[in-house]
Amino acid sequence: MTDTQVTWLTQESHDRLKAELDQLIANRPVIAAEINDRREEGDLRENGGYHAAREEQGQQEARIRQLQDLLNIAKVGEAPKQSGVALPGSVVKVYYNDDKSDTETFLIATRQEGVNEGKLEVYSPNSPLGGALIDAKVGETRSYTVPNGNTVQVTLISAEPYHS
């Protein structure tokens, strides 16, 4: 498994997501009972409560699958140990298109992790910018394509392990 297939999580984020998953799983019998109660009300074609409970069940099961998938590929508390290389879990500073005054600092991670709570912008390692920077060394310039089809050059100024 490569680092771009792994989701880096702080221990706090992992614990929060695991608690949410546990709560959703514990809630399964409640929704199942609600569906059963609504089913007993009669004609299912005109039973809004039944359909609402089924919709809620579908949304809950989708979130359970999403959390299970995320937690299965997560690296917990393993921020990159090295500085100078852009990896998932790194705070990077870059400039764009040879304009050294146009700098940006951000975290390479996934937004749903809940890391840094708005202190830094977060770019996924699977995004065009994040993907272009993975394994880049300080001073290295990479290119990526933006949604309008243009190519942007980005140069890595610094890369440090994330510390919450």
Curated annotation (Swiss-Prot):
The keyword Transcription regulation applies. The keyword Zinc-finger does not apply. Keywords: Coiled coil, DNA-binding, Transcription, Transcription regulation. GO terms for biological process: DNA-templated transcription elongation; regulation of DNA-templated transcription elongation. InterPro entries: GreA/GreB_C_sf, TF_GreA/GreB_CS, Tscrpt_elong_fac_GreA, Tscrpt_elong_fac_GreA/B, Tscrpt_elong_fac_GreA/B_C, Tscrpt_elong_fac_GreA/B_fam, Tscrpt_elong_fac_GreA/B_N, Tscrpt_elong_fac_GreA/B_N_sf. GO terms for molecular function: DNA binding; RNA polymerase binding. Residues 50-75 form a coiled coil. It comes from the Bacteria. Necessary for efficient RNA polymerase transcription elongation past template-encoded arresting sites. The arresting sites in DNA have the property of trapping a certain fraction of elongating RNA polymerases that pass through, resulting in locked ternary complexes. Cleavage of the nascent transcript by cleavage factors such as GreA or GreB allows the resumption of elongation from the new 3'terminus. GreA releases sequences of 2 to 3 nucleotides. Belongs to the GreA/GreB family. PANTHER family: TRANSCRIPTION ELONGATION FACTOR GREA (PTHR30437:SF4). This is Transcription elongation factor GreA.
